[in-house]
Amino acid sequence: DYSWQIVDGGDVRAAGPFALAFSGGHHATIHRSIPIVDNVGVFVNETLYYPGDSFTVPPGAVEVLAVPASAPWLKIGEVMDYLDTVRPRRAFPTHERVNSDAGNAMANARITAVVEAHGGSVTVLQPGE
């Protein structure tokens, strides 16, 4: 059994040893015909930030960013702009399973180029990691 709570951008919660700060509020637009739903990003212990299905800029400096790499709501240029804004010290791609191997190689190269240009590093996780 797990308990759960609905959260909004600006909410702060604790879950065991984790301090969770939520930001944002809306899913990125997929298409004008598809209603926009709620979405929040989460900052874990002021270290790891995961924006969910959006490009919400986190409320502080980011040590580790779980960066969306592919999804029906994004294009790689937007990912690159987001990385230019957030400038994480470390990043790892998420949302990548919809890509082919060639698509992942292209996205990972673009993500790595931007993160490294700002002095950071990228780790590409494999399934199961």
Which residue ranges define each predicted feature?
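Conserved residues at the C-terminal ends of beta-strands
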Residues: 45, 68, 94
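Charged helix-capping and loop-helix junction motifs
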Residues: 36-37, 76, 80-81, 105-111
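Active-site metal-binding motif and surrounding structural segment of the metallo-beta-lactamase
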Residues: 1, 62-66
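Binuclear metal-ion centers of metallo-dependent hydrolases, dominated by the metallo-beta-lactamase
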Residues: 3-19, 90-129
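Proline-aspartate-enriched helix->loop->beta-strand connector
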Residues: 76-96
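Short histidine/acidic/glycine/proline-rich micro-motifs that form metal-
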Residues: 27-28, 70-71, 97-102
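Core dinuclear metal-dependent hydrolase active-site scaffold
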Residues: 4-60, 73, 126-129
